[in-house]
Regions:
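Canonical Radical SAM [4Fe-4S] cluster-binding loop centered on the CxxxCxxC motif
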Residues: 1-47
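Radical SAM enzyme [4Fe-4S]-AdoMet core and its adjacent flexible, acidic
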Residues: 37, 124-217
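Acidic (Asp/Glu)-rich catalytic clusters
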Residues: 52-55, 83, 105-114, 133-141, ...
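Distinct, well-ordered alpha-helical segments
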Residues: 73-78, 98-111, 130-136, 156-165
Length: 217
């Protein structure tokens, strides 16, 4: 199936995979849940996805964590329970270990490129995680995007230079720069005045599109 032709109907559903990431990103809103993961298991994931497919056969599904790529074989089993009519997104740090290198990770993700709409890869100005080699991005055939959170350092003098180097590093790749979304509300999501991150981005890049509320309905 051509993933670009999939339609979306119904709410986006986020599934927290049953694997902790062993990281401590300060903006993570899920870490507290993984302090006790006794209620997480794969069978519950399967049942939830099967039920979801019956209720919302055309909605978006997001795998997040924790770390969805902590167990690649289990990830493939979970993907198999996502119906072909869904858009599937995976949030990951692309973790490597002695049991899985970048080639193994790329092999698994590429094998499911017809199912995966996008792999969202966490990379930040501050290194909160152990990052694998950037060579992996040349190995990935599946669509992928670099997600960078500017946490509380948008005002720091060094952030501008770091961000420019970051964008040069990932030149040619999709990059999403965002603030700590746990601070967003329906009231402030469209406010740009006094927004340190928005000011920083306007200082180094040309912003070409208006903030249209219609796009967020």
């Amino acid at each position: 199936m051509n993933i670009m032709k999939k339609i979306k109907e119904g709410p986006t559903v986020t599934m927290f995979v049953p694997y902790d990431c062993n990281n401590s990103c300060p903006f993570c809103v899920n870490k507290e849940e993984y302090r006790n993961s006794s209620s997480f298991d794969l069978d519950r994931c399967y049942r939830s996805l099967d039920l979801l497919d019956r209720i919302f056969p055309h909605n978006d599904v997001v795998f997040t964590g924790g770390e969805p790529l902590a167990e690649l074989e289990a990830l493939e089993d979970i993907i198999a329970h996502v119906g072909e009519t869904h858009n599937l997104y995976i949030n990951t740090t692309l973790p490597t270990s002695e049991n899985q290198d970048i080639h193994r990770i790329a092999e698994v993700l590429n094998r499911h490129q017809d199912m995966i709409s996008c792999v969202n890869v966490s990379r930040h100005l501050k290194h909160y995680v152990k990052e694998c080699s950037d060579e992996i991005f040349d190995l990935l055939k599946v669509r992928h995007r670099i997600n960078c959170v500017i946490f509380e350092d948008a005002k720091e003098p060094s952030t501008k230079e770091k961000l420019i180097k970051f964008l040069d590093r990932f030149n040619g790749h999709e990059v999403q720069i965002r603030a700590n979304y746990s601070n967003l509300t329906l009231e402030n999501v469209f406010e740009t005045e006094g927004d340190d991150l928005f000011d920083l981005l306007c200082d180094i890049a040309e912003y070409q599109y208006p903030l249209e509320k219609e796009l967020f309905r």
